């Protein structure tokens, strides 16, 4: 029996957590879950570097993890969502304890898990462009491996990403290559999300509509044509791509709304059920509250869409 200490407290209890290649007994009074066992993290040089934090943001980590926000027993829908915050592949939030998006989904009976993934400029990485996807795949496997513990239906586990987090999320949903196997018991679980919710999402690395900062940080300032094509996720859509909801502001000056449009066109061409909502105002990075005008409706639209897609009950 392995014992793991976690850093954040939430109310009540003990549960058994099937983790790595064995069984871990941990206290549900803790909510931070590391993604990889010691010495088994792929794409790592083996450096153990402290988190780099400044002005409320995390700029580097060699300890990728998820933060769990389980739904209350009385309103648990059985659905789950992996939330990927934005930050241009430069930074992530440093405090996950009050993540508004996670708390919103949790309040609706959806089990929420917030991903803190490795960032491409980490000195520990061998292939920087692979790390966010590796961590996202592993997170999905952890959620499904422990579905019974959180009363989750493994067939209703999706991903939600904002801005560059939308690129991580859409990469997770479209790229077929398994880049996260490490030879433990979690490898057997699917990393593919059942649905995607992409808000102000970076999708394409094509010059005309690219968010240059995200592209340069992930694949370099002078990437090959092949690399640009591979990480322009509209090119990776197939009929197997998960059903998707796209939300964007038409006046987004950071990530052009054409990112969502080209992804919708690819989904439509492949016959994937998809919905797109482009609101006139609100700029970049809608939140679950305090959006202007009609954009204030997007969280309600997301809930109705999840019902329509049979991900949560009516």
Each model region followed by its residue ranges:
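N-terminal cap/lid segment of alpha/beta-hydrolase-fold proteins
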Residues: 30-75
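C-terminal catalytic histidine-bearing segment of alpha/beta-hydrolase fold enzymes
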Residues: 261-314
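Short beta-strand/loop motif that positions the catalytic acidic residue
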Residues: 246-248, 252
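Catalytic nucleophile-loop/oxyanion-hole region of alpha/beta-hydrolase
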Residues: 93-94, 99-101, 117-154, 292-296
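Short beta-strand element of the alpha/beta-hydrolase
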Residues: 77-86
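Primarily recognizes the serine-hydrolase "nucleophile elbow" in alpha/beta-hydrolase
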Residues: 138-210, 228
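Mobile cap/lid helix-loop segments that gate and shape the active-site cleft of serine hydrolases
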Residues: 53, 201-236, 242
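Conserved alpha/beta-hydrolase "acid-adjacent" motif
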Residues: 253-259
């Amino acid at each position: 029996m392995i014992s793991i200490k976690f850093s954040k407290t939430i109310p009540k209890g003990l549960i058994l957590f099937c983790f790595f290649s064995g069984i871990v007994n941990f206290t549900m009074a803790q909510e931070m879950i590391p993604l990889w066992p010691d010495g088994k993290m792929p794409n790592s040089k083996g450096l153990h570097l402290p988190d780099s934090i400044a002005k409320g943001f995390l700029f580097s980590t060699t300890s990728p993890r998820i933060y769990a926000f389980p739904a209350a027993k009385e309103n648990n829908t059985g659905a789950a969502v992996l939330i990927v915050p934005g930050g241009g592949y430069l930074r992530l939030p440093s405090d996950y304890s009050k993540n508004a998006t996670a708390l919103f989904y949790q309040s609706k009976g959806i089990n929420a898990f917030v991903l803190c993934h490795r960032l491409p400029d980490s000195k520990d990485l061998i292939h920087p462009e692979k790390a966010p996807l590796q961590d996202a795949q592993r997170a999905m496997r952890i959620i499904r491996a422990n579905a019974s513990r959180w009363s989750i239906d493994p067939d209703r586990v999706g991903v939600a990403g904002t801005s560059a987090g939308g690129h991580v999320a859409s990469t997770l949903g479209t790229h077929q290559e398994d880049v996260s196997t490490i030879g433990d018991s979690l490898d057997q679980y699917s990393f593919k999300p059942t649905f995607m919710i992409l808000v102000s999402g970076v999708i394409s690395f094509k010059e005309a509509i690219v968010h240059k900062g995200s592209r340069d940080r992930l694949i370099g300032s002078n990437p090959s044509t092949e690399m640009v094509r591979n990480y322009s996720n509209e090119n990776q859509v197939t009929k197997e791509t998960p059903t998707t909801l796209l939300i964007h502001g038409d006046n987004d000056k950071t990530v052009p709304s054409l990112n969502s449009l080209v992804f919708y066109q690819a989904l439509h061409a492949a016959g994937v059920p998809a919905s797109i909502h482009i609101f006139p105002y609100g700029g970049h990075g809608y939140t679950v509250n305090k959006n202007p005008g009609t954009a204030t409706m997007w969280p309600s639209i997301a809930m109705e869409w999840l019902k329509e897609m049979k991900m949560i009950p009516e």
